[in-house]
Curated annotation (Swiss-Prot):
This is Transcription factor S. Zn(2+) 1 binds at C4, C7, C22, C25. GO terms for molecular function: DNA binding; DNA-directed RNA polymerase activity; zinc ion binding. The lineage of its organism: Archaea, Methanobacteriati, Methanobacteriota, Thermococci, Thermococcales. A zinc finger (TFIIS-type) spans 67-107.
Length: 110
């Protein structure tokens, strides 16, 4: 990755013209194939399906808002909630809930 020295946005390589281009401010900088190869290499591409389970490993839940919703596992009536974009950008985001009592996490399907 390379960032624009003028505006700080991500620069993209234009390999045909052999330059780095900032799509925000238009700044250009020469591209060196040998030196810049690692900056443009995709080392791992991860693709997710919309129905995959998403697990929040560590998060300070006390900072999340709570709402009145029934936990499908224990019946508790309060859960933390957060919103994430899990599908394409033109589709609605997904709301996740985590029970304040048992910790069970589920998503809302609207």
């Amino acid at each position: 990755m390379k960032f624009c020295p003028k505006c700080g946005n991500l620069m993209l390589p234009d390999r045909k013209r052999k330059v780095w281009v900032c799509r925000s401010c238009g700044y250009e900088e020469p591209f060196d194939e040998e030196k810049d190869r690692e900056k443009t290499k995709i080392t791992k591409k991860v693709e997710h399906k919309p129905d995959e389970e998403i697990i929040v490993v560590e998060q300070d839940l006390k900072t999340l808002p709570t709402t009145k919703v029934t936990c499908p596992k224990c019946g508790n009536d309060t859960a933390y909630w957060w919103e994430m974009q899990t599908r394409a950008g033109d589709e609605p985001s997904t709301i996740f809930y985590k029970c304040t009592k048992c910790g069970y996490t589920w998503r809302a399907y609207e």
